[in-house]
């Protein structure tokens, strides 16, 4: 039998089923030769591959062991010796497998041996079609491969039925398994292995052996499970086999005759998995789901190698894909389904396969994943959320880059530290982050103690789940939502700035209400939990897999519209509560609610009730606190969303050094020490600033803060430039390597967290009161400044663009979208509330102007220029802003805070902000190119053209993550905002733009330009007023085409040398917006763009405010 099968098989190998004894030897020799030298004979290699595939698939494929490489090599080595035995065994196994997927009695082998041709045919039929027919070739090579691999693979396979089936010949290796026992254990092994392997292992094996053994593993896997989930090709597979050739010829040979057998085998194999232990089955299924969700879609396109190469992006892409396909807790696993993510997940949890269920079922990912109820609480409370936080942390490990994971993990560690008392505040913050209104409603409906006691109605969970589904459906909307959130965050920031002064009593009552919470929050716990909650929210927004959190939060908000926060809240809640509610809907609601809340007197302080019943006062305080938390939560959510969006590209956030430094110094310090705002800001700022350098002493930080503050106020970035200049150079050096970018992205993430913490403290207003608002805002803006600097110079072009883009959002850009418009109003209110001399008109004006001029530096001055001079173009340009800051640093802080928050958060989603409502954000991206394009434009990634190509609107950003196009797009969107503020300043600071190109922190040069721009400033002012008129149109116009046009024209006219303004800038804008009028004077371009854009939000800044062509013209006038 041995000889006959060998002869037949080898003959079959050579003749593809002829059964030549003579050809068996030559075929084998050829096969060996083919293995040894793949280029030998395609036919022979095909035959050999078929053989190898057959044996390998029958043995290793079943066991999920990829015998590909070993099979090939060993068949080379042993092909001649054990060929017939293994071939017979293989044939028998194949035959039996095809006949029965269960183990076979020894007789099976003889059967197959007796009819080697048939067995080969069946092997071909079974193997050929799925495994490219490689195994169809006679069993000789397969036997060879089996022999060589038999000892290892069969033993590993626990001598599946094949070995046992294998006559004594195979028994030499499969001696361990007697002929009779195989039927008993083989079925179980087959069932376990078949189900697990076919689903997961088999898929991998099959994929591996398919690529490595030319379908051998595939054949085997096909027989067993027919399931070919993104199998991972063995590392060693390809060298010895021609998978394509094998697959093609073998498949052709074996498809016709053996397809039926193969189908039967697959069916039988599918039947066997039932026998598999449920544990293994579940684990395999989980793994399969993970792999399928993450890799399954790409199994055909992305092989294991591609997956590995694109693992970071694939994880994110799969997160979205999985969410889109079906939003499940497994989405996290899906996100982590990529091997690396799975490994990380495994690291987090004992078994990656179980991870998904653990997350889903709350088996506990490193931290107990309590029940969904706990999860629900988590979103609502700090305590519960800390347990959930680990769960989410695990999810992050699966879906997020290592750095983000570490970021979340350190945040989660603080969550873990959060105490129940803190939990209330944390919960409030977390709820406010996503569903602040829900938190308000919860607080209104339930006492904080109830909340602390996890009194959240479980029904909200159900709504949340439905919201999960809606979020999955709204994956694309999540990014637009981020834009809306940015607007809401701007409003929240404005409210915070407003409440910082107004809510001192507010905070006091709030502090009274949650004195313990506040004290703990000051320690950073509440802030940490909020921050984490926000991070989760952002994560969910940025990574749809986490949409669950924002969904939960939004659902809470939707479900609990009863909060005092706003009447519109209930309306929006009704909208959001709908099954189809999307994060974007929630963002819109939150924005609206935030705007309504801002208008409410509670922000000013508790109502008269405060004077009345202590209970009422407490209730009022709680309401105030909730509203503040809502705003801050939204702001944090935007910041975190921005962070996640930036970090969606894993490289941005994956810097172990940065991660550690940020985690050890800034985060804990910010949370633990009361000046956490100061120390945390400084420490984080420090660590963020210099990843390598540990957080410096608070004194040094204070000095630096003071210095930077004075620089901000004075508008001289020299010192700052000096400090960051070295860093900038270093970053530039590293940026090419991608180190600085990831490092700075991580820093930015930490800084965002720090800002969140600061905002929380500001929210409680305790820190502000203790520090004094000036000090507080100094620190806050210093941090923001560092963040902006980091991004303007070193890090993300998107962030740079975001820095400017907030001006658009802050300015009239908000008007375009209702949320934005509300934000604009809020900003104006904030300016007024904030002690800004100029109230709404100036603040918008100033906001738009300063960010464009210098997103970083001008942020604090943003409010000042309004105060400084609405009528003086120069001040508008941003010079006045900084001087105004000097004059009224507190006011500047107020406006600056709103503007800064706008800049940071709205910039984070500036495109989304505009696109959320107008969807014309992508044009805005162009504006960023102008304002930040100084640097960004310089950088090829940020070239406006690319931004245009990358796509318009936040969708590109959401899609692109870190892709240059996306960054460019975001930048362009942001630029859309900048050009207005910047366009006015650009004509003035044509040179200043250039200097900005040299250093983003050159408000002074911009100021100089501003001095040059008196007319432009006036134009901008005119445009601002016009813009405000056309803010609504501005959303579309917000695209910053106007910015590009106006800025371009000004740049070209005054700053022809400016890269933005240069022909490339012009052409970039044209290519990006393809607005014919871009090339020439700004007026034409701007007007046309504005018309095209229906109001250039990019001009939102000032010209941007004049989204209308008339506005632009007025600005130009």
Swiss-Prot record:
GO terms for cellular component: cytoplasmic vesicle; rhoptry membrane. Residues 752-788 form the BSD domain. This is Rhoptry apical surface protein 3. Residues 1-27, 47-243, 258-301, 325-398, 415-442, 490-572, 600-619, 654-736, 829-848, 858-891, 909-964, 1031-1066, 1095-1117 are annotated as: Disordered. The keyword Membrane applies. Keywords: Cytoplasmic vesicle, Membrane. Interacts with RASP2. Residues 83-100, 197-209, 275-300, 510-520, 546-555, 724-734, 1046-1062, 1108-1117 have a biased composition (Basic and acidic residues). Residues 418-442, 490-508, 839-848, 909-931 have a biased composition (Low complexity). Residues 1-12, 530-540, 557-569, 829-838, 1031-1044 have a biased composition (Polar residues). Disruption phenotype: No defect in tachyzoite growth, intracellular replication and host cell invasion. Its main location: membrane. It is a peripheral membrane protein. Disulfide bonds: none annotated. The keyword Membrane applies. It is found in: Cytoplasmic vesicle, Secretory vesicle, Rhoptry membrane. PROSITE patterns: BSD (PS50858).
């Amino acid at each position: 039998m041995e000889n006959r099968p060998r002869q037949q098989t080898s003959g079959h190998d050579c003749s593809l089923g002829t059964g030549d004894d003579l050809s068996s030897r030559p075929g084998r020799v050829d096969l060996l030769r083919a293995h040894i030298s793949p280029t030998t004979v395609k036919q022979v290699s095909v035959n050999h591959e078929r053989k190898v595939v057959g044996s390998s698939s029958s043995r290793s494929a079943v066991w999920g062991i990829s015998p590909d490489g070993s099979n090939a090599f060993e068949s080379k080595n042993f092909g001649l010796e054990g060929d017939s035995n293994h071939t017979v065994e293989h044939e028998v196994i194949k035959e039996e497998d095809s006949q029965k997927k269960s183990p076979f009695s020894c007789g099976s082998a003889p059967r197959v041996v007796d009819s080697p041709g048939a067995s080969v045919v069946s092997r071909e039929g079974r193997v050929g079609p799925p495994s490219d027919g490689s195994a169809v070739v006679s069993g000789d090579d397969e036997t060879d491969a089996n022999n060589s691999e038999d000892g290892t693979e069969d033993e590993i396979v626990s001598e599946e039925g094949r070995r046992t089936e294998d006559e004594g010949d195979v028994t030499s290796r499969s001696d361990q398994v007697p002929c009779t026992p195989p039927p008993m254990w083989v079925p179980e092994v087959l069932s376990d292995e078949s189900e697990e392997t076919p689903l997961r292992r088999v898929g991998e094996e099959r994929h591996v052996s398919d690529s490595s053994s030319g379908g051998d593993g595939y054949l085997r896997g096909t027989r067993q499970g027919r399931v070919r989930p993104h199998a991972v090709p063995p590392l060693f597979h390809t060298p010895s086999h021609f998978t394509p050739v094998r697959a093609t010829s073998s498949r052709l040979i074996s498809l016709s005759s053996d397809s039926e057998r193969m189908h039967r085998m697959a069916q039988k194999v599918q039947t066997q998995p039932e026998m598999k232990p449920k544990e293994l089955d579940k684990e395999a299924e989980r793994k399969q789901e993970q792999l399928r969700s993450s890799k399954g879609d790409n199994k055909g396109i992305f092989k294991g190698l591609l997956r590995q190469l694109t693992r970071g992006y694939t994880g994110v892409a799969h997160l979205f894909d999985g969410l889109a396909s079906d939003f499940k807790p497994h989405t996290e696993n899906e996100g982590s389904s990529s091997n690396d993510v799975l490994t990380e997940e495994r690291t987090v949890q004992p078994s990656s396969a179980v991870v998904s269920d653990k997350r889903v079922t709350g088996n506990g990912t490193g931290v107990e994943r309590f029940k969904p109820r706990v999860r629900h609480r988590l979103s609502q409370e700090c305590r519960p959320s800390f347990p959930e936080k680990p769960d989410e942390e695990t999810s992050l490990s699966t879906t997020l880059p290592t750095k983000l994971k570490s970021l979340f993990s350190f945040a989660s560690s603080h969550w873990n530290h959060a105490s129940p008392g803190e939990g209330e505040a944390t919960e409030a913050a977390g709820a406010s982050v996503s569903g602040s209104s829900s938190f308000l409603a919860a607080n209104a409906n339930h006492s904080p103690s109830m909340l602390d006691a996890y009194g959240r109605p479980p029904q909200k969970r159900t709504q949340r789940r439905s919201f999960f589904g809606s979020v999955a459906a709204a994956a694309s909307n999540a990014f637009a939502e981020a834009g809306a959130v940015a607007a809401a965050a701007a409003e929240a920031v404005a409210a915070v700035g407003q409440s910082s002064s107004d809510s001192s009593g507010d905070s006091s009552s709030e502090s009274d209400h949650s004195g313990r919470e506040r004290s703990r929050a000051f320690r950073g716990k509440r802030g940490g939990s909020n921050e984490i909650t926000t991070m989760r929210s952002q994560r969910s927004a940025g990574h749809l897999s986490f949409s669950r959190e924002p969904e939960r939060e939004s659902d809470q908000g939707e479900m609990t519209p009863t909060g005092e926060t706003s009447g519109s809240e209930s309306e929006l809640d009704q909208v959001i509560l709908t099954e189809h509610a999307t994060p974007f809907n929630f963002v819109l609601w939150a924005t609206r609610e935030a705007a309504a809340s801002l208008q409410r007197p509670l922000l000013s302080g508790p109502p008269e009730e405060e004077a009345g019943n202590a209970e009422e006062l407490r209730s009022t305080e709680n309401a105030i606190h909730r509203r503040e938390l809502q705003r801050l939560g939204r702001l944090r959510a935007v910041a975190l969303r921005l962070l996640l969006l930036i970090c969606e590209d894993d490289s941005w956030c994956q810097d172990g050094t940065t991660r550690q430094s940020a985690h050890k110094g800034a985060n804990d310090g910010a949370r633990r020490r009361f000046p956490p705002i100061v120390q945390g800001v400084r420490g984080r700022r420090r660590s963020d600033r210099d990843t390598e350098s540990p957080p410096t002493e608070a004194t040094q930080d204070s000095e630096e803060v003071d210095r930077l503050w004075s620089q901000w106020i004075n508008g001289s970035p020299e010192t700052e430039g000096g400090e960051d200049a070295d860093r900038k150079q270093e970053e530039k050096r590293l940026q090419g390597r991608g180190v600085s970018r990831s490092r700075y992205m991580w820093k930015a993430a930490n800084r965002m967290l720090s800002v969140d913490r600061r905002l929380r403290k500001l929210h409680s207003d305790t820190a502000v009161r203790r520090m004094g608002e000036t000090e507080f805002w100094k620190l806050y803006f210093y941090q923001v400044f560092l963040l902006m600097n980091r991004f303007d110079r070193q890090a993300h072009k998107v962030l740079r663009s975001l820095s400017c883009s907030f001006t658009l959002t802050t300015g009239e850009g908000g008007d375009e979208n209702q949320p934005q418009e509300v934000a604009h109003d809020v900003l104006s209110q904030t300016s007024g509330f904030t002690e800004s001399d100029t109230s709404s008109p100036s603040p918008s004006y100033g906001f738009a102007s300063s960010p464009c001029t210098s997103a970083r530096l001008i942020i604090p001055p943003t409010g000042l220029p309004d105060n400084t001079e609405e009528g003086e173009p120069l001040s508008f340009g941003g010079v006045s802003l900084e001087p105004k800051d000097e004059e009224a640093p507190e006011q500047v802080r107020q406006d600056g805070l709103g503007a800064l928050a706008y800049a940071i958060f709205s910039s984070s989603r500036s495109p989304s902000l505009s696109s959320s409502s107008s969807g014309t954000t992508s044009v805005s991206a162009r504006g960023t190119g102008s304002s930040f394009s100084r640097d960004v434009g310089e950088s090829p990634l940020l070239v406006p053209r690319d931004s245009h190509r990358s796509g318009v609107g936040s969708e590109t950003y959401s899609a692109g993550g870190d892709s240059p196009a996306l960054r460019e797009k975001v930048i362009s969107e942001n630029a859309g905002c900048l050009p207005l503020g910047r366009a006015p300043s650009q004509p003035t600071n044509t040179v200043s733009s250039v200097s900005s190109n040299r250093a983003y922190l050159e408000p002074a040069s911009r100021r100089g330009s501003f001095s040059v721009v008196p007319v432009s400033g006036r134009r901008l002012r005119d445009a601002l007023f016009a813009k405000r008129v056309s803010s609504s149109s501005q959303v579309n116009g917000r695209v910053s085409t106007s910015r590009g046009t106006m800025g371009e024209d000004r740049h070209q006219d005054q700053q022809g040398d400016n890269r933005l303004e240069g022909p490339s800038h012009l052409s970039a804008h044209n290519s990006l917006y393809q607005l014919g009028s871009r090339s020439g004077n700004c007026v034409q371009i701007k007007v046309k763009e504005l018309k095209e854009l229906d109001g250039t939000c990019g001009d939102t800044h000032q010209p941007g405010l004049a989204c209308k062509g008339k506005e632009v013209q007025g600005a130009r006038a």
